[in-house]
Amino acid sequence: MRHQLRIPLLSKPADQRKALLRGLTTQLIREGRVTTTKARAKALRNEAERMISLAKDGSLASRRRAIGYIYDKKLVHSLFEKAKERYGDREGGYTRIVRTVSRKGDNAQMAIIELV
C-alpha cells in the first residue's frame, strides 16, 4: 500500500518511473538544465538534490551510491570534484524550476529545471 508516500506516480509503473528519473537526473547533471513537464520537474528536483548532497559529502560510500544511480560513471566523478566548491555554502536548494509555456500537442504545463 502506498499510504502517505510523497513521490508522484507520473502515470508509470515503478520500474519505468525510476528509469525515467535516473535518466532525467543524469541529463540535468550533465547539461545543467532540462525542459520537461512540471510534474516531472518536481519529482526530479528531489532526486537531483539527493545526488548533489551525496557529492558534497564526498565519502566512498556516497560515491558508490551515486554511481549506482547516475548512468554515467565519468559524470559522477566530475560531479564529486565540483560539488564542494560550487555548493559548499548551500544547505539545499540546488535546483530552480521555472515555468514555461504549455506544450502545443496536449497543453501540458512545461517547466525548465536548472542547477543553481
Swiss-Prot record:
HAMAP family, per this entry?
A: Ribosomal_bL17
A molecular function annotated in GO for this UniProt entry is:
structural constituent of ribosome
Q: Name one Pfam family in it.
A: Ribosomal_L17
How does the annotation summarize its subunit structure?
A: Part of the 50S ribosomal subunit. Contacts protein L32.
**CC terms in the record's Gene Ontology section:** cytosolic large ribosomal subunit
Q: Which domain of life is it from?
A: Bacteria
Which family is this sequence assigned to? Belongs to the bacterial ribosomal protein bL17 family.
Which GO annotations describe the biological process of this protein? translation
What InterPro entries has UniProt attached to this entry?
Ribosomal_bL17 (IPR000456), Ribosomal_bL17_sf (IPR036373)
UniProt-listed Gene3D superfamilies: Ribosomal protein L17
Q: Does the keyword Oxidoreductase apply?
A: no
UniProt protein name = Large ribosomal subunit protein bL17
Q: Which organism is it from?
A: Prochlorococcus marinus (strain MIT 9215)
- Keywords for this entry? Ribonucleoprotein, Ribosomal protein
